[in-house]
Amino acid sequence: MNGHFAAVDNGNGSSPDSNAHSFEHGIQVINEDKQYNTNLNEYLNETHVAEAGFNYHLISVFGSQSTGKSTLLNHLFGTQFSVMSERERRQTTKGIWMSKNKNEGKMADNILVMDVEGTDGRERGEDQDFERKSALFALATSEVLIVNIWEHQVGLYQGANMGLLKTVFEVNMQLFLKDKQNQTRSLLFFVIRDHIGVTPLANLRNTLIQDLTHIWSSISKPAGLENSKIEDYFDFAFAALPHKILQPDKFISEVQNLGSRFIAGHRNKDSDATDDQELTGGVFLPEYHRRIPADGLSIYAEGIWDQIVSNKDLDLPTQQELLAQFRCDEIAREVQIAFDAAIAPLEEQQAESTRAGKPAVLPNLGQIGAEAREKCVKNFETQASRYHKGVYTTKRAELEDKIDNRLKALYQAHLTAAHKAGVTAFSEAVANAVKAGQKAGGAYEFAEIVEKQKTKTLEIFKKEAQSLAIPGVAWSNFKPQYLIFEKELDEVSARLRKEEMRRLAIRVERWVKSRLGDAIGLEFNKLGSGRGGSGAPESGEKPATEKDIWDRVWKAFISIVGEAESRFTDRAKSFEASDDEVQVGLWRLRRKSWVALREKIEEEVMESNILMKLRENFEDKFRYDEDGVPRIWRPSDDIEGIYTRARESTLGLVPLLSRFRLTSTSAPPDLIEFVGPQPHGVEPGDEEDLTPIGGVDEDEGKSLEEETTILSEPKKQDLVVRFKKMADGVYVEAKRSAIGGITQVPLYFYAVLLVLGWNEFVMVLRNPILFLLLLLISGGTYVAYSLNLLGPMMQMANAASTQGMEIGKAKLRDFLENHEGARGALGMPPKNAQRVESGISMDTLDSNGKRKETGLGAEDDI
């Protein structure tokens, strides 16, 4: 039968099937050599006790050797412990064996029975070391200690195992009195065998109680417990069984009745000294349980036995704490496996995105993290809360710290990514909304756009942060991160507002430049309006369009800048810009407007431009009379006088244009007053792109006079020289035109003409037709000469004659091509080899009446 039990050396490294076979009838917990079986936990798992938690009970049986302890357990619990052969009187149970109750129908669940090696055996003789150690082990682990004695041994010291019970009492004082907060009680269940019935069970009970009380009073007790009673630490129960051999049927019946008592019960408060049973309902009271979870029983028992074997003082609370530490660590590692499976992929995904430089916002991270944490903590609580409360609380806190540190790092990185993504999305949303507003016509409220997008972005981040919140966990309150995010959005909003105001300033500056380009260009174009038709006299004061040009330029400039300031201020209000920001923007606008005006003026007075305007001004005065009619120069005209007056008048513009002066003050405009003082809100970045202005910026070193000087002295002199050369050319051209109209014919030619042509002259005068024809020709020639049409008429006549010749050539070519004889005589090629000649029309002739050259090339004249 022992072959069906797992001994200490069996089961290591065996398969589950072999373990099931080895554990069929139980396991040897301690062998005769005092070695502990580390396979106990496998046995508990195989019998499904390990998963029972606290729902199990442990019973140990004591008694003298060969008194039928194993037989009693086999009948009572259905176990199959080895029993002594009736033909041999030798030891059968060696060490401590354990088996699970097989008769579970009427008993409590998961009853574990330990069969302890009998005492007073001849095999060990005087060696009582194992006897004491096994008693200490059983008392430290068991709820109920069954003492198996025969009726005739009641009243005896050795026979009734009183020496063993004394050891039990001493061990109890050693173990449980150290832990005064938890006075663990034990039940001594006396099973009196071979009870004949002559002596009532109550009398036997009284005898045993008296003996036990006497033993209790004889043992030494700690200070303060000298007067303690045995009933303060032990409960007693009694049962009697008839003789197994002589009364087998009754023995079986009483054993079954005895088995019904191994259920949960409670204390009978109304019991008296004559009762043979002090417990009601069953022998398993809650205070008997050692409060060691079933899955930790093997480790706990091993620690207990190691302490016992090494003869160290056994401290059960310490052992329970050590067990709790071991099991809590083990459970923590187990529950973290599932936690790792859920969180590790997210950590890796986040790490990869961070390495790539694009932190990712993980979807459903809060839900996944909260569920993984809750599951991990709940599983730990379910399995570990059954152990020592102090250790459990500490280990749970350690587990929560460990998983919370991982979640915290993951969540913070997640919020950092959400933070960056939110800022980017906010900036892009504002930019897109501004672009949409500009495309819609430019009417958009920047402040409303920023506030709307900010509220939307904050709500998204808030939801993301709230999704990471774990109830009851302080660190998961990400309100500080929310406040930091809100603060950064405010900073981004301020930056975007500043950028938008900068863009607004750029748009206004462009508008100012555009308006200045038109207005200033118009004023400078008026410099050419010096002709008489405009009311400008040839002498005296300069026309109004010339002498007050700078007043009109400054007036137009002030008007444009004022309108620009109004536009800027109105738009800046829609940005909710502060007064300082508005003042800085206006200050920058005025400075840049003056620079734009100065650049436009410099463009107008560039050498090529100003020289052209001076020429136009001069030609208007020289080529046109007082009424604005073009002059036709004749030799009798005072060309020199007109030229001198027009030249001097135009040269008077050079000093006028060389300096920006107002006629009202005869001084430059007050740029210091125009620009204004530097506002308090100006930052260094606001001045980086500003051009220094002389007379305004003290550090520039230029004076207001230098700032308003348009043409330097060398430039003026060069301009005067170049203008005079140009004016001289115009004068020479006019003079040549006047002289070129006089034909130099010798006077004698007229006398010769009169003598030689007198007959013809008289004939014409006498012939009315010729006379009228002469009058018509003479009149037409005079009119054509007066209107300067002789040239065009001669050109038209030349073109007509040339066209006639071209048409004649074309007709001749057609004749030759169509006449076989002519073509043969001239050796012309066949007709199909000739190029097709296009017809002649007016649009194919040039100004001389000749055919224009085409891409096909001109035909050779015939």
Curated annotation (Swiss-Prot):
Transmembrane segments: 745-765, 769-789
Compartmental location: Endoplasmic reticulum membrane
Binding site for GTP: G63, S64, Q65, S66, T67, G68, K69, S70
UniProt GO molecular function: GTP binding; GTPase activity
Membrane topology value: Multi-pass membrane protein
Family the UniProt entry places it in: Belongs to the TRAFAC class dynamin-like GTPase superfamily. GB1/RHD3 GTPase family. RHD3 subfamily.
Name the record gives this protein: Protein sey1
Originating gene: sey1
